Each structure stands twice: as C-alpha cells, then as structure tokens.
From Swiss-Prot:
HAMAP family: GTPase_Der
Gene of this entry: der
GO biological process: ribosome biogenesis
Ranges where the EngA-type G domain occurs: 3-167, 204-379
Name of this protein: GTPase Der
UniProt binding sites for GTP 2: 210-217, 257-261, 322-325
GO molecular function, one term: GTP binding
Organism expressing this protein natively: Bartonella bacilliformis (strain ATCC 35685 / KC583 / Herrer 020/F12,63)
Keywords from the UniProt entry: GTP-binding, Nucleotide-binding, Repeat, Ribosome biogenesis
Superkingdom per UniProt: Bacteria
Lineage: Bacteria, Pseudomonadati, Pseudomonadota, Alphaproteobacteria, Hyphomicrobiales
Residues annotated as domain KH-like: 380-464
Length: 473
C-alpha cells in the first residue's frame, strides 16, 4: 500500500513550495499572500529514493466551522486522516506563534507519525526559530529551505526514521509508472497507420471549467459522491486546478477542477492571474472540457468566450446547464437553450449540451454518456479512400468558386491527425480559398462521418505541379 504524506501548518509557511519540491513540478500555486491553497491536492512524488503520495493542504486557521476558513480546515483534517505521516511545517524565520502551538496539539491527537519541518532556515535569522520549535513537543525540528532546496537529505532521513524502512520502501516502483509526464498543450496525435484502435483502458481527461460560482466544484463532488472539493456561496472559492482520479462504469476518469474564469479586464491581482494561467493549463491538458453554465443566467459573454477558447485549443466542448433544479417549464427552456447553442456557437455544429443539477446529482450519467461518446469521435480515424469518395461527391455537388476568373480545384484529402480530427486538403491556390467553402467542407465532414460537436482542423496544401521550375524549350 502506498505511503501517503500530508503537509500541514498555518498559512504562508511554505507548504506548497515544499509540495512542488517533492513532486518535482510547479503544480501548486505559490504566492506571498497567505491562504493561497484552499483544496487539498494529492500527487505522486519521487523524493530521492522514496516514492509516495503527497497531499498539499490549506493553511490551518482559527475560524468557525461554517466560514470559508473553517471549511478549509475541515479539508485539512481529512488529509490528516488519510495520511500515514504528517509533515508539520513552520516558518523558522518568524518563529513559533500561538497558532503553531494550537495546531501542533491538533496533529498530535491524530496519533500519526509526525516530522517537524522548520522551513525558511536558510538565513541566520531562523536560528532562534529552530530552537523555539522544540517547544511544540513534536520532536527534533528538521531544518530545510524548500525554496532553495536545502536540507532535503535530512528530511528524507527523518521520513524514513518516522515510518520505518519497511513502510518507506515497501511501495517503491519504477519511476516511469509513478511520475506521469504528459505534454501540456498536446496538439494531437500524428497518424502513421490506417487503423488506429480506440483504447478504452486509457483514462479520459476531463476539465470542469466556467465562470466563477456556476457550481463547478459542487458538480465534481456530486460525481464523486463525497465532499472532496471546497464549495460555498463565495465566488472564486477554487483557486488552483485540482486533479482527481475517478471511475465511472469501469472507465477510468481523471477530473480537473478549475478556478472560475472572469473577463480579462476584471483580472487585476497577481494571484488571480496565476489561477487563470493554471486553469488554461488544465484546459490544454484535458481532452474533454465541460463548460458549466448557470441555467438561471446562461450565455453571458464570458460563457461564450470560454467555449470558443476550448474549441480553439482543439478540445471537446460539452456544455452543462447546471442548477437545472431551479428552472420551471424545463422542456420549453431546454429547446430554447439548444437553439441558442446553435446560433451563438456555430464554430462546432452539433455541440453537446446537457441539463443537470450538481447539487442533487441529477443528469450526471447523461453527461458522462455524452462525454464517452464524443471522446470516441474525437479519436476517430477515417480511411483515405472513404474521404476521397466523399470529397468527389461534395465537390461535384458544390464546386469551389472562381477567383479572378480561375476556378479553384480541390483534388485530394487525407486525415493527418486525431485529437482533434485534422485533415489535409490538396488544392490549387490555397491562399485564396474562401473561409465559407472551408466551412462547407468542415460541416460536410461532420455530417457524412457522424462527428457532431467535435472541433475539426483543415489545412490546405498546394498540389504539386511537375512543370513548375522546368526549363522552357
């Protein structure tokens, strides 16, 4: 069974910096402002010769349970319960505070092994804080600097001593099976063979995106059947993208909760800019993006811009009309919403849109059925023979226009990518091919090969002319 380590402590002591150091990637947002981390984040780590799962947590604060800070503390308590070992982090520069004393008592009650980590120990100013740390009653402090990578060998030894060698090394696995290295912003898979088989054993990467306060985290909690993510009436509760593994009808799913995207003109603070960057990274890494609309106020300008962003990134967009439990005259409203989808989002004909209620768990199976269906289409490979028989038919029915008195010729088509489907068309004078004709071909491909709701990429190439460059006789 995998070793799980939780990083806990009061706000702004460097927990997320240590988390990033352990996983070897800048996954967690880091800022000088306290309280950046809110949800608990779990990731596989390789720390020297140790392999384990590490949990980043929100800073522990004194607050009532019903407040945002109180709900954040509840998430941290869950992480403590899930962990085999606790890294209790303090700021050696600022010394011990009353909050450190109170929360040290909290983690002691868990009866879990604890390693006391005196972070920010790179300067002489931290010397007194390291000595003060003994007063917490958590044993000898391990002095490190997560930012500068100092003292990490001592931390490794402290972890092994705390859990024992058997537990520390029991779950050691090959690096390539523990550390997942996927290319963020993948532009698709090049096709070299005719028959690309759809792999149902591979996980589907799904990002949940949308404006702030549309119910994204509530929807994921409902999908999981547990309060995994922090939710609340406050807008902008989620700050960074959280990855969660899930299984639906025996299909492995990797979910990404993301921070709400506001209009660019409203984004002023550095922290929100970091959150937006993290959300965009999650969208590019995902395969399917569920854009959550508030059914009581759908199709705001920002909703449409987010869908357009997903399409431009080549990901599969699916609209989730959330808070459907608040809607009356459901059938009439749904028909109107589908009509608006077709009118306001013509970039992808046949865009999937599903009404649901994240709060009550209604419509989730319908959403997932649409996701698995359209994900298969996104991976579809069409043979060159079928494509060219189709091309001959549509060009005969509607030939390309004449430009400057010379008719354009479309000669050949082949699929060069999946994820999203990408096609190369050989034609004369591609630089003057009208966008209207390309839309005609793109929509024709969707209709003929049953690819509704999926972005399609068309690229044009000049057909080779064997006489170009030949010497005149």
């Amino acid at each position: 069974m995998s070793l799980t380590i939780a990083i806990v402590g009061r706000p702004n002591v460097g927990k997320s910096t240590l988390f990033n150091r352990l996983v070897g990637k800048k996954l967690a947002l880091v800022d000088d402002k306290p309280g950046v981390t809110r949800d608990r984040r779990i990731h596989a780590a390789r720390f020297q010769d140790l392999y384990f799962d590490v949990i980043d947590t929100a800073g522990l604060e004194e607050a009532d349970d019903h407040t945002l800070e109180g709900r954040m503390r509840s998430q941290t308590k869950v992480a403590i319960d899930e962990a085999d070992l606790i890294l209790f982090v303090l700021d050696a520069k600022s010394g011990i505070t009353s909050s450190d004393l109170n929360f040290a008592s909290l983690v002691r009650k868990s009866e879990k092994p604890i390693v006391l980590v005196a972070n920010k120990s790179e300067s002489k100013a931290a010397t007194e804080g390291k000595y003060e740390a003994w007063s917490l009653g958590l044993g000898e402090p391990c002095a490190i600097s997560a930012e500068h990578g100092l003292g990490l060998s001592d931390l490794r030894d402290a972890i092994v001593d705390a859990v024992g060698k058997d537990k520390a090394f029991d779950n050691k696995k090959e690096e390539d099976t523990i550390i997942q290295s996927a290319s963020v912003g993948d532009n698709g898979d090049d096709l070299e063979e005719e028959g690309c088989i759809y792999d149902e054993s591979a996980p589907i990467r799904i990002a949940i995106a949308g404006r702030p306060n549309t119910g994204k985290s509530t929807l994921i909690n409902s999908m999981l059947g547990q309060d995994r993510l922090l939710t609340g009436p406050e807008a902008g509760v989620t700050r960074d993208s959280i990855s969660i593994d899930w299984e639906w009808r025996s299909r492995h799913i990797k979910l990404f909760d993301t921070a709400g995207l506001r209009r660019k003109s409203k984004i002023q603070e550095k922290l929100e800019k970091l959150s937006v960057t993290d959300t965009l990274r999650a969208i590019r890494f995902a395969e399917v993006v569920v854009i959550v609309f508030d059914s009581t106020a759908p199709f705001e300008k920002q909703d449409l811009q987010i869908v357009d962003l997903v399409i431009r990134e080549g990901r599969v967009p699916i609209i989730a009309f959330n808070k459907w439990d608040l809607i009356e005259n459901c059938q009439e409203i749904l028909a109107d919403l589908h009509e608006k989808c077709a009118c306001l989002l013509p970039q992808v004909r046949g865009l999937r849109a599903v009404p649901l209620s994240g709060q009550y768990g209604q419509g989730i199976d319908k959403l997932m059925e649409n996701i698995t269906m359209i994900h298969r289409i996104w991976n579809r490979r069409i043979s060159t023979g079928k494509l060219n028989r189709w091309l001959e038919t549509v060009v005969t029915r509607h030939p390309p226009p004449a430009i400057s008195g010379r008719r354009l010729k479309v000669k050949y088509i082949t699929q060069i990518k999946t994820r999203p489907p990408g096609f190369m068309i050989s034609c004369s004078r591609p630089e003057v091919m009208p966008q209207s004709y390309l839309r005609y071909l793109s929509n024709g491909l969707r209709d003929a090969f049953d690819m509704p709701g999926v972005p399609i990429r068309l690229s044009l190439r000049t057909s080779d002319n064997p006489f170009v460059g030949s010497a005149k006789k």
